[in-house]
Structure formats: C-alpha cells, structure tokens
Amino acid sequence: MKANDVEMAQLFLRAERMRMCAISSCERTRKILRRHVERGEVVRPARGMYARAAYWSGLSKPEKMLHVMRTAQSIHPDWVFCHESAAVAFGLPVSYERLGAIHVATTRSNRNANSKTVRWHVVAEDESVIVQGLRVTSLQRTVFDCMRMVDFGQALAVADFALRLGGGRASAFVSHVRRIGGNLEGAAHAMRTMHYADARSESGGESIARAAMIQHGFALPELQVALPRPLDRRRSYRVDFLWTRLDGSRVIGEFDGMQKYEDAALRGGRT
C-alpha cells in the first residue's frame, strides 16, 4: 500500500470512529482528498469535509447531518446549533427535505450572511445544552423553532415527540413560547398546534395521520389502547387508534411505517 493510501486510510478511520467527516489543514492532504473525490471514492458533504463514499452511503440522512455538525463543532467550538440541526441531535422527527444546510444560532449584533452550508438565526433568551456532544438550543426552543416553520402535520409530529421526550405539559410550552417569542413568525401556529399534542403518539407517521384526521373533521381517537387477544384474553395487544361508536362498537386504526417492514426486530421473524 502506498504511503498516501495509508495516510488516507488512517485519516478516515479516525474520523469514522468519532462519527465525523475527515478534515485536514494540510494543503497536500487536501489535494489528495480532492483527487479521490474526482475518482468517486470520496464524497465532500460540505466545504472542507470529506468521507469515504462507501461509508457515507451507509448512513441515514440524520446521521449524515450529525457527522457534518460534529465536524463543524470541532472547527467552531462556540457554535450553537438550532432549528432542524438541533432537532436532529435531540432525535425529533424532522422531514428529510429540511435536512440540508446546518442551522446556527447567533445574536442581532453578530449576524452573519447565510451560505449554502450554514444558515444563521437570531436566538435570544435561551440557554444552550449539550446533546450527543453538540452545543444546541434548549429542547423547548428547538421544538418551538421547528414547529413554527412547518405545516400542521409535521408540527404535530414534533410536538407529540417533545411531550414524550421532555415529559412536560402543552400548557407549559405555550407559556414559554409567549415569553420568548410570541411575536415571531409562526408562533401562533406553534401554540395552536401544541394544544393537540399527545405524548402517547409513538411515531411521526402516527402524528401526521392524526393531524389529517383533525384537519378533515374526524372524531379524535384514543391512542395506543391495549385490547385483550381474542384467543388468549390473558394477553393483550395495543392498537394505534381506537374509536368507540355511539352503539358501543369499536373501530381500530393502524399506521404502518416503513420501519415495520424493514426492521427485522419489529417483524418478529415474519416476512
């Protein structure tokens, strides 16, 4: 193996162990990396950041975003990530369409120009926290910023997950929003949506389905209800949605996300 190949292998191995992209301040190394990019062996997710093509293709979109964020944090340790970038760190359900540039918090007096890679947002009255080794806006602020910029279905998915993750009450969130940014764009939308939030919802897909029910005027179902098994009443199973009619009969609704078909653990050996 050539010396350059050994150097590249070690560079990528160190980065991958840290779940980051490879970077280098050495111009000679960067030239070698660019040649690998031209040959299709290496990808450049962001300016100055590199990853092996085979490794990168095996990552999910959120994992790719976290790699870029960790790399950016190593270069700019004072950065605080916000909006969808912070949401990914918390594990909030975010549409992949919104995972492009990284979002960084700033102040009015220190605002920078947006670029293809970085979007800057003025964030006031918030204490940053460390999540997955990354400096991010607080959970409440992150939830608020995400909810106010997306449609009702996506906002409800974020709201449901936030209640499940943080264990708080919707009313507390609304009070917090009024204090920190009640006049910001989309604040009223975020507060209205939070009134429908339910921590019992177990996936973003279930939340989006429930949002459609609300928008179309359907009666709201009970969520995650345990019912006895017909052939073994000592055991039970849970349904995603349950409606009870006036005559006492019941209607069951299920939301099947792709994970149920792709995750062997969820299939339990079934095809």
Regions found by a protein language model. Give the residues of each.
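Surface segments flanking catalytic/ligand-binding clefts of nucleic-acid enzymes
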Residues: 2-20, 24-28, 163-271
